[in-house]
C-alpha cells in the first residue's frame, strides 16, 4: 500500500432494535420458555442473539455460520443438547421474522408498480430504449417489472439488455456511487445489487431495503416517484429499471430461501432425535414428552407449511425435564460406551458357544480361568442380599449419567419402555476407491438400563424387575436408590482456609463490596459452603438453580445464608464480530462504543508550569533550544490579570 493511502472502510453498520426478550416471538414461545432461553444464554452474547432473531434476510448457509452463543455454567450438564435446541429456536424465530419481511416486500412492490406510477415508469422505459437505438424492445423488460417469478437467469438476461442501453447512452457509474455499493447489502444479504450509476439511486435503494427489513411501514420509492416531471432524466429511468428488476428477483429468492429454512429447521429436529433418544434413556421420566415430540415431527414432515410452535414447545419442555433430572447428558459417548460393552459381551458369548475362552487374539490366563473377567465384573460388598456382581463398564450404573427416577415402575417396566430397533453404530472404511460402512445393531439398551438401575438400588436385575411388576399392584414397595454418602468425603463443602480468612478479613475492614463474605465468629464452627466449578451460577440465579449439597453437609452447617455462598467469577461481556456480514457486527461495535474510556484530562497549566519549573520541566524534544515555549507567554499573561 502506498504511503499516505487509507484502507477502504467497511460497510456501514445497521441499527436493529433488540428488546428485553432478545426478539424471541411471543407467538412461538411462551413466557416460561422465553425466560428459560434468557437464563441459558450468557449476557455477553445476548445482543448478538437478538440480532439473529430479528430476521435480516440471509442465506441459510450464512445464517448457520453466523449462529453463535454461549450457555451459562448452570446448564453445563445439559449443554450438548441445549446448544442444539437453542440453535433450532433461533433458526425458527429468524424464519418467522424474515417471513414477515417478505410479506411487507411483496405488498410494497405491488403498491409501487401500480397506477399512476406504473404509466410514468413505462413511459420512461420507452424514452430510454428510443434514445439508445440498440434494438432493445421496451416489452422485453417491462414484462418482468410486475412478475413474481423473476429467476436469476431472467434477471441476468434483462440486465444484459439494460447494459446495452446504458453503453449506447454513454452512462457510467460514478466513483462516488461505486464507493456506496456496500450499503446495498447492509440490511439484506440476499439482494443482488445492480450497478447503479448515481449516488442518489444507491442511497434510495439502501433506504428502501432498510425500511422493509425494519418493518417501518414506509412505501417504496423510486426516482420517478420523488422527482418532478421536468427534472427526470434518462439516467433516472435506467436506475429505476435496475431497482424494480432486482427487487422482483429478491422477492423470489427470499421465498425460496424461506422454504429451504423451513425444511431445514424440521430436519435439524429430526437429526436431534438420535441424541434425544439416548437422553431419554438417561432420564426415563421424559418418556411422554419425547414421544409427543417424535409424533409432532412426523406430522410436520407431512405438511408443506408446518407450525413450529408445538415442536418448539416440546423441545424446550424436554430440555427443562432433562435439566431437572440433574444428569450429565452425553448421548454420543453413551452410544459408543453401549456399543463397546455389548460387543464385548457378544464376543465372549460367541466364544463360549464355540467352546473357547476369550477372543481369538487374546491369550488365556495361566490357570486356565475363562476370559470372562475381561468384562470387568465388579462385586458390590455393600449389598444385603449376598454377593452381587455388576458390569463396571456399564455407564448406566453411574448415578451422574443415569439416575433411577421416582416411582420407577411407571417408566422402567418393559411395556413402558420406548424401543428403538434400528439403533446403529456405524464405522466408515475406504476400500477399492469407495467409502464402505460397517454397522452394528445395539439391541440391549433396555437390559443395560435395568442392570444399571439394579446396581444403584443394590438389587439383582431379576429382583429389580420383580419389584417393578409388583409395585403397581401394591404387593411390593418401589425400589429406592441405595445411598453411600457416609463412605466418602463430601467435596461440596470445604472449610475456610487461613488464606481465605485473612483475605476476607482485610476485605471486610475496607470498603465493603456486594460480593464480600463476612467471617463467622471465633466461637462458631460454621464452614463456608461453596459450589464446584460445574455448578457455578450467576448471582441472580444462584438461589433458583440450587446447590448439590449432601444431607450430611446440611446437617453439619449452622445458618448458611445465600451471602455465604461462593460467588462465581465475573464474566466479561463477549460480542462476536462478523466483519463479512455487516448486519451482525453491530452488537460488537455498539458494545465497544459504550465501553470506550475517555482519555485522562491533561496536566494543569498555569504560572507554576513553565519550561523552567513544574512536573515536566525537562526540555521537550518537540521544541528547539532557541524556540520560545508557549507556556511562558501563558504564565506572563496570567500574572498580569
From Swiss-Prot:
Chain intervals with Basic and acidic residues compositional bias: 632-641
InterPro entries in UniProt: Herpes_pp85 (IPR006731)
Low complexity: compositionally biased ranges: 500-563
Composition bias, Basic residues: 589-599
Biased composition (Acidic residues): 358-367
Domain of life: Viruses
GO (cellular component) term, any one: host cell cytoplasm
Keywords attached to this entry: Host cytoplasm, Host nucleus, Host-virus interaction, Inhibition of host innate immune response by virus, Inhibition of host TBK1 by virus, Inhibition of host TLR pathway by virus, Viral immunoevasion, Virion, Virion tegument
Pfam families: Herpes_pp85 (PF04637)
GO biological process, one term: symbiont-mediated suppression of host toll-like receptor signaling pathway
Ranges for region Disordered: 353-373, 500-572, 587-641
Family as reported in the entry's similarity comment: Belongs to the herpesviridae pp85 family.
Protein's UniProt name: Tegument protein UL35
Species in which this protein is naturally found: Human cytomegalovirus (strain Merlin)
Gene: UL35
Amino acid at each position: 500500500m502506498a504511503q499516505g493511502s487509507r484502507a477502504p472502510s467497511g460497510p456501514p453498520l445497521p441499527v436493529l432494535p433488540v428488546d428485553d426478550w432478545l426478539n424471541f416471538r411471543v407467538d412461538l414461545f411462551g413466557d416460561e420458555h422465553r425466560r428459560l432461553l434468557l437464563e441459558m444464554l450468557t449476557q455477553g452474547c445476548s445482543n448478538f442473539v437478538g440480532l439473529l432473531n430479528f430476521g435480516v434476510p440471509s442465506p441459510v448457509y450464512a445464517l448457520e455460520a453466523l449462529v453463535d452463543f454461549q450457555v451459562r455454567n448452570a446448564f453445563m450438564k445439559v449443554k450438548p443438547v441445549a446448544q442444539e435446541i437453542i440453535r433450532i429456536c433461533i433458526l425458527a424465530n429468524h424464519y418467522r421474522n424474515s417471513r414477515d419481511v417478505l410479506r411487507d416486500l411483496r405488498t410494497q412492490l405491488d403498491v409501487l408498480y401500480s397506477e399512476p406510477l406504473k404509466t410514468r415508469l413505462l413511459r420512461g422505459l420507452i424514452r430510454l430504449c428510443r434514445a439508445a437505438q440498440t434494438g432493445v424492445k421496451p416489452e422485453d423488460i417491462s414484462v418482468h417489472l410486475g412478475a413474481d417469478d423473476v429467476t436469476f437467469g431472467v434477471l441476468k438476461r434483462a440486465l444484459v439488455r439494460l447494459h446495452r442501453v446504458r453503453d449506447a447512452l454513454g452512462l457510467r457509474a460514478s466513483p462516488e456511487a461505486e464507493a456506496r455499493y456496500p450499503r446495498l447489502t447492509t440490511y439484506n444479504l440476499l439482494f443482488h445489487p445492480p450497478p447503479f450509476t448515481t449516488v442518489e439511486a444507491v442511497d434510495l435503494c439502501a433506504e428502501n431495503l432498510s425500511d422493509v427489513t425494519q418493518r417501518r411501514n414506509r412505501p417504496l420509492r423510486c426516482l420517478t416517484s420523488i422527482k418532478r416531471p421536468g427534472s427526470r432524466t434518462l439516467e433516472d429511468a435506467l436506475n429505476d429499471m435496475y431497482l424494480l428488476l432486482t427487487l422482483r428477483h429478491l422477492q423470489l429468492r427470499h421465498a425460496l430461501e424461506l422454504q429451504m429454512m423451513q425444511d431445514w429447521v424440521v430436519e435439524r429436529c429430526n437429526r436431534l432425535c438420535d441424541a434425544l433418544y439416548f437422553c431419554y434413556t438417561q432420564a426415563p421420566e421424559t418418556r411422554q414428552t419425547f414421544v409427543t415430540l417424535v409424533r409432532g415431527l412426523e406430522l410436520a414432515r407431512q405438511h408443506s407449511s408446518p407450525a413450529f410452535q408445538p415442536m418448539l414447545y416440546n423441545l424446550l419442555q424436554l430440555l427443562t425435564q432433562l435439566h431437572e433430572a440433574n444428569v450429565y447428558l452425553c448421548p454420543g459417548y453413551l452410544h459408543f460406551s453401549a456399543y463397546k460393552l455389548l460387543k464385548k459381551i457378544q464376543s465372549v458369548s460367541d466364544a463360549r458357544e464355540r467352546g473357547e475362552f476369550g477372543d481369538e487374539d487374546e491369550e488365556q490366563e495361566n490357570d486356565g480361568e475363562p476370559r470372562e473377567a475381561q468384562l470387568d465384573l465388579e462385586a458390590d460388598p455393600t449389598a444385603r442380599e449376598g454377593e452381587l456382581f455388576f458390569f463396571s463398564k456399564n455407564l448406566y450404573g453411574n448415578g451422574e449419567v443415569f439416575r433411577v427416577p421416582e416411582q420407577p415402575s411407571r417408566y422402567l417396566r418393559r411395556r413402558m419402555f420406548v424401543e428403538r430397533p434400528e439403533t446403529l453404530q456405524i464405522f466408515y472404511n475406504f476400500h477399492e476407491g469407495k467409502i464402505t460402512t460397517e454397522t452394528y445393531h445395539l439391541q440391549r439398551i433396555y437390559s443395560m438400563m435395568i442392570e444399571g438401575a439394579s446396581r444403584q438400588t443394590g438389587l439383582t436385575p431379576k429382583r429389580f424387575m420383580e419389584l417393578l411388576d409388583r409395585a403397581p399392584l401394591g404387593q411390593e414397595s418401589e425400589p429406592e436408590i441405595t445411598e453411600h454418602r457416609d463412605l466418602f468425603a463430601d467435596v461440596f463443602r470445604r472449610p475456610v482456609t487461613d488464606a481465605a480468612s485473612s483475605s476476607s478479613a482485610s476485605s471486610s475492614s475496607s470498603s465493603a463490596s456486594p460480593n464480600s463474605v463476612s467471617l463467622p465468629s471465633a466461637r462458631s464452627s460454621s464452614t463456608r459452603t461453596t459450589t464446584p466449578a460445574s455448578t457455578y451460577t450467576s448471582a441472580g440465579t444462584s438461589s433458583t438453580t440450587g446447590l448439590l449439597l449432601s444431607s450430611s453437609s446440611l446437617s453439619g452447617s449452622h445458618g448458611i445464608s445465600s451471602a455465604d455462598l461462593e460467588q462465581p467469577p465475573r464474566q466479561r461481556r463477549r460480542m462476536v464480530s462478523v466483519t463479512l456480514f455487516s448486519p451482525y457486527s453491530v452488537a460488537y461495535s455498539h458494545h465497544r462504543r459504550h465501553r470506550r474510556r475517555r482519555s485522562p484530562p491533561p496536566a494543569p497549566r498555569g504560572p507554576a508550569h513553565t519550561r523552567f519549573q513544574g512536573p515536566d520541566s525537562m526540555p521537550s524534544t518537540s521544541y528547539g533550544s532557541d524556540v520560545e515555549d508557549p507556556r511562558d507567554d501563558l504564565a506572563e499573561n496570567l500574572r498580569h490579570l
